[in-house]
Amino acid sequence: MAIIYNPNKKIFTLHTAHTTYQMQVDPLGYLLHLYYGEKTNSSMDYVLTYADRGFSGNPYAAGMDRTYSLDALPQEYPSLGTGDYRNIALNIKNEKGVESADLLFKSYEIRSGKYQLQGLPAVWADENEAQTLEIVLADENAQVEVHLLYGVLEENDIITRSVRIKNTGTGQITIEKAAAACLDRKSVV
């Protein structure tokens, strides 16, 4: 299987012939990027480090935990207005001009075949050549859902990415920026 979910650790693992891509839903519901590199069967959650970050913002749900900051954690799909001051993947604005989306894990689905992008150029695969992982992140206050789509063609060594943004409310939202991916990699100095 190219896509594996470990419900105990809440880790998604995507395997190709030579690479592994891993993400984890943390205890607060944020989707964190763990690993992308040479193929491994190990759980890479040990790469997450928590240190006192007294001057970094943290989500309200973190309470007084100064070791939890989105500015220091490798988010899979970071958005503006959550205390992460690095490059973002998403910036939306509601009709009142508020630019913020606090995206938390809502659901996921693993299915056979690769997702389709109607009217856009894309990699195509037969039903038995690929698997799709769809992860839904949502902000109930901003009334927006972000559907992260991962297409895994294991034998071809390909992982594709796409994003669908859904307005779940009645008000208008403006998409100021939307990227298919934001790969957060630690620098090695």
What positions do the PLM features span?
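N-terminal accessory beta-strand-rich subdomains and adjacent acidic, glycine-rich linkers
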Residues: 1-189
